[in-house]
Every structure is written in structure tokens, then in C-alpha cells.
Amino acid sequence: GLTFTDCHMPQTEAADGATYTHHNMTQSPLENPAALEKCLTCHKSQGVEDADAMVTFVKGKMDELAQIQQATKTKLDEFHAKLAEVVAAGNADETKLQAAKDAYNLANVYFLYQGTAMRPTDGSMATMNFSKSVEQLQKADDAIAEGMAQIA
């Protein structure tokens, strides 16, 4: 697998032919020709032909993940609102209510973990591990469904 430095700090060739480590690690790899070349060492075998196609591929995955993230976020917000409504009504079965609260907390952890707490819905984690992010979102969705069933 790749590491942060493989993508954000690739080996770059200077004008004199010397190889050095690119140190602008805050730059998006999508804006760095050396980083895109590193991507293509694997992705060419998947039909991604050049740097422009690589950027299109990555942005497509980011958009796809952002849509899944936003759908989960909407469910999580609806679950939170339903929990608040049930608590305010004051007549819920305490065991079921606690199970629902626990499910909400678990779903929220999965949701925040998959995208980092700072950027949970922008799709940027697609480049790090798309399938793991989707897996975490599915776990969040499952916990939401289980919790909502407790207070339905």
C-alpha cells in the first residue's frame, strides 16, 4: 500500500537530474504532476490512461463518497431529531430509549471516524480508502436503523 509521503511528498527530479523529495505536502496530489505519475503506476492497469484521467477518476470517487456521506448524515440528523422528540415526550420505555441512544452514539462514531471529524461529508477520504469509508458508513447506517427501530 501507499503512505502519505508517497502521494503528498513524491520523489521528484530536479532540472539537473538529481532526485529529491517534494516537500510541499499541503498541496493536493491532484495538482502535482509527480504525484499523479505515482498514481498512474497502478491505475494505468485499471484503464486510467493519463494525469487528466486520473484527476477525473479521483474526483468521481470523491463525489461518489460525498453523496454516501451526505445520505448517512441526513439519516443521523433525522435520528437525532427523533430521539429528542421521544425524550421530550417523556413516555418512552427506558430500556429501548437507552438502546436507541447507544445506537446513535455508535452511528455517530462510525460517521465521524470514516471521514475524520473535521471533514465528514466532503468525500476527500475517498483517496485514502474508499472501501473502508463506505464500510464505516454502512455500519453507521445499520446502527441508525437499529436505533430507530427501538423508538419507532
Stretch-by-stretch model annotation:
Residues G1-D6, P10-I151:
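Primarily the internal scaffold of c-type cytochrome electron-transfer domains
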